[in-house]
Amino acid sequence: MKHLFSFLTLALLLSGCTQKEVKAPEPISPLPTPQQVAWNKLETYAFVHFSLNTFNDLEWGYGDTDPKTFNPTHLDCEQWVKTFKDAGMKGVVITAKHHDGFCLWPTKLTEYCIRNTPYKDGKGDIIGELSAACKKYDLKFGVYLSPWDRNYAEYGTPAYLDYYYAQLKELLTNYGDIFEVWLDGANGGDGYYGGAREKRSIDGKNYYNFPKIHQIVHELQPNAVIFSDAGPGCRWIGNERGFANATNWSFLRGNDVYPGYQKADELTSGHADGDTWVGAECDVSIRPGWFFHESQNDQVKTVDQLTDLYYRSVGHNANLILNMPINKEGLISKTDSTNLVQFYQNIEKQLADNLLKGITPKVSNERGGAYVAKALTDDNYDTYWATDDNVINSTITFKLPKAEQVNRMMLQEYIPLGQRVKVFTVEYNDGDKWLPVQMNEETTTIGYKRLLRFKTIMTDGLRITINDSRACPCLNNIEAFYAGETTDVSFDNQAKDIQSLNYKVLNVEETDGDKIKDKNGSTVLLIDNRYITLDLGKSVAINSFLYLPDISGQHKGSVDHYTIQVGDSENPTQTIAEGEFANIKSNPILQIVHFTPVKARYVKFSAKSLASEGPMAIAEIGIK
C-alpha cells in the first residue's frame, strides 16, 4: 500500500509538471494608464458652472463684469455634494476660472477674484468650501481652469503664461487631491484684456506650452487625469450635447490632435488608427446653457432625456460629466436636483436584474486557465474570457433557465490589455432558429462599456458573435436585462416652442424664407450676404429677437457676433442691439435678445462674424 501511494503521488506530480501553463494575452497598444482605467470606472460625475456669469445672465463674460455683482445669499456646497451623491455620481469638477478670468478662490495673483466680492465680506473661498464638502462626503474633486482669460491685460504674451502656471499651482497645492484637471479648448478672441477691449489671436497649439502644463499637473497631482480636446488623460467628445458615437475608440493620433483642434467631429468616434489612449468624456448641461439663467427654469432636461444621455455616453464607451448650474442663491435649483436623482434611480431600476447572472456561457473558443467563459459572469472586473492567440472571431452563447423578456444588454472589454473588438452581432433564440436582435445603432466597438437598447424580445437564448477584432478578444462582463417598456425622447424641440409675430422675409425667395418660421429645426436657411430683413407688415411694438442656429450637428454658419437694426423702411438703420452669442458653435441653442421696447415695421439681423466659414445659417427666427 505504501508503494502504491508513492507511485500515485509521483504520477500526479509528473502530470502537474507537464501541464502547459496558460499565459495571459499580450497587451495591444495603445494602452491606458492605471489612472485612466480608474477614471473610466467613475462613469458619471458632475460639472459645476458658477461665476460672475451666474449673476449677470451671461454664458461667456467679456472680462469686465463687476465682481461686486457676485453675491450668493444661501450658498451651500454640501447641498450640491449631497445631491451628487444621491444621484450616484462619483465626483465634481468646478469652474475655478472661466473665460472671463474671474477666480472663485482668493488667489494672490489677481484682484479679479472672490476676495473683492460681497460674498462673506471678501473672505470666501468657494473652491475651498467645495473641496471640504467633497472630502466630507467622499466625492472626488476636480478643477476647470480656462487657459483663455478675457480679463488679464497680458493675455497673448509670455507674461500671461507665468500667471497661468502660477494659478494652476495654487489650485493643485492648496485643495487636496484632484482627480481631473479640465482645460477648455476655447481660446483667443475679443475681450476686456485690462481695458484694451480688443481681439487677440494666439497659436492655440503652441502658445500655452501644454507639455509644461501637463508636467505641472503630473508633478503636483500624479493621479489626476487631464481633460482637453487632445487629453492626454481624457478627450472632449466633439459636441456639447452629451453624445458619443456608437463606434467609439479610446484612441487618438497623438501628433495630430491638440487643444482647440478644429476637426471636432473626429473626436466623437476617436481614431481607429490612433497611437495614444485618450478616453472620451461627454460634457452636457442639464439646462440649455452652462450657467444659470432664470429664463431656462422650464427647460431642464427630463428624466427620460437624461436616461437617453446615459446610454449614449456611458453606454458608448465614454464618461458622462453632467453640468448642474448653480443659481443666484448658491444652490442647485429644485427641478434640476429632482430630475438628476430620479434619472439615477431610473438607470438603477432599468439595469437592476441581470438575467445572465451566474450563467456560464458556451463559447466557440477559450484560452483556458483563468481566461475561460465563466469569467464573463463572475462579477469580477479583473477576470476575463479570452480566445487563443490569432482567434479574432468567436461566439458566446447563453442558455437561460426559461424564456425571458429582454431589451437591454451590457458588454465590457478588459481595457488594461487594450481595446480590441471592431465588430460584433447579437442574436436571440426563436424556437428552432437564431434571429438577429434589431438594433437602432451599429454594433462595432465595445471598449470599457457598451450598452445596447432594443425592442423587447422573448427568448431563452442569446448569442454574441465577435466578428472582427484587433487581436484575440478579452471580455470581462456580459449582462442582459428587461428594463420595462420605455418611450423615445427628443432633444431638438427648441424650434416648435418659438412664438413670434407674423413676418415676411424680404431678401430671399419666399419658399426659402419659410424655412425660418416652419418650427422645424432641421430646415436651415443659408444666406451668402450674411443679413436678413424681416417685414412685420406694419409698425408694431417689439422687445425681443429669437435666433435658432443650425442644430443638425453640421456647424454651418452660426452667427456668433450680431447686430439688430429696426426702422420703417426696407433698409432699417436704427441699431437696437448688438453683441455676442457665446459658445454657439459647440452649444447651438436658442438665443434670445431682449431690448428696450421699440415700434418698427422692419427688422434687419446681420452677422458681424460667424463661428465657422461659409454662408450665414438660420434654422428659426422669432420676433416678439
Task: Describe the predicted segments one by one.
Residues 2-8:
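Sec-dependent signal peptide recognition
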Residues 397-399, 531-534:
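Short, well-ordered beta-strand elements within core beta-sheets of diverse protein domains
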